[in-house]
Amino acid sequence: KPDPEAVLIV
């Protein structure tokens, strides 16, 4: 699954 920080960028 995607990184938690990556979700914030998205």
UniProtKB/Swiss-Prot annotation:
Primary location class: secreted
Compartmental location: Secreted, Cell wall
GO CC field: extracellular region
Keyword entries, A-Z: Cell wall, Secreted
Protein name, entry field: 46 kDa cell wall protein
